[in-house]
Amino acid sequence: MFHHVSVMLRETIDELNVKKDGVYVDCTLGGAGHALYLLNQLDENGHLIAIDQDLTAIENAKEVLKDHLDQVTFVHSNFRQINQILDDLDIDKVDGIYYDLGVSSPQLDVPERGFSYHQDARLDMRMDQTQELSAYEVVNEWPYEDLVRIFYRYGEEKFSKQIARRIEKTRENEPIETTLQLVDVIKEGIPAKARRKGGHPAKRVFQAIRIAVNDELKAFEDSLEQAIERVKVHGRISVITFHSLEDRLCKQIFQEYEKGPEVPRGLPIIPEEYTPKLKRVNRKPISASEEDLAENNRARSAKLRVAEILK
């Protein structure tokens, strides 16, 4: 069963200033908690386009949203295809778009998905199980230099070189096939003193591999830049992130579009092409409430950023 507790459910949707007859896009359908909360605010003219690259999530969501099926279009795709998805549906602009990034609880909790460093399973980590590249290929086939790069860039792991070297040495003899095998190899690459602080020693490397397998950061960047162009004036975009890399990227993109192009000196009035595309609704990200934290420990690292489209 695909059971997932949605983080910052009310805040994410309420910040969209939902119009009863609006058209909205859920870029990360997951357990459909946000979708259900939104649909309950729409009248019969409102509609939701629900995107997920995990077929299991979509099948579960159809059950969760069974009272609203005539108001939902389910799309099995990566959210970086948002332009194509809206074009295919003959939709130009929508009233709001939202993202709940990161891994859903069921993906972490089902050992066979190969995301968890607590449970043993074959290395996988694919959010879209129809894609070819999995964690197994990354760990066993990617060269040392690429492993160092992703561990450092996506995991902010300071022992990236040592861990990549241990992986390289281990796989010379036999493939690293399971999550707990990989955990043991990672531990060997981290000095004993460092292993005792900063949470689970494999956390950062697992995050890095997951991001690489699913091309998460580039996919999000592509998607958010498209989303900004597909939301109507005064429509909003809500984004929940779960680690500093995603949050930083979201902040940078919003800032870039808020600044607008450099205005030439001496103009008596500023032409529209030099005005900002959007404004950030919250300068500082919104954090999870105590209520959220009590329900879901993952909410501790969650941050919500919201932007409103101006033109």
UniProtKB/Swiss-Prot annotation:
InterPro entries: RsmH, SAM-dep_MeTrfase_MraW_recog, SAM-dependent_MTases_sf. GO terms for biological process: rRNA base methylation. Pfam families: Methyltransf_5 (PF01795). Keywords: Cytoplasm, Methyltransferase, rRNA processing, S-adenosyl-L-methionine, Transferase. GO terms for molecular function: rRNA (cytosine-N4-)-methyltransferase activity. It comes from the Bacteria. It catalyses: cytidine(1402) in 16S rRNA + S-adenosyl-L-methionine = N(4)-methylcytidine(1402) in 16S rRNA + S-adenosyl-L-homocysteine + H(+). Its EC number is 2.1.1.199. S-adenosyl-L-methionine binds at A32, G33, H34, D52, F79, D100, Q107. HAMAP family: 16SrRNA_methyltr_H. Specifically methylates the N4 position of cytidine in position 1402 (C1402) of 16S rRNA. Belongs to the methyltransferase superfamily. RsmH family. This is Ribosomal RNA small subunit methyltransferase H.
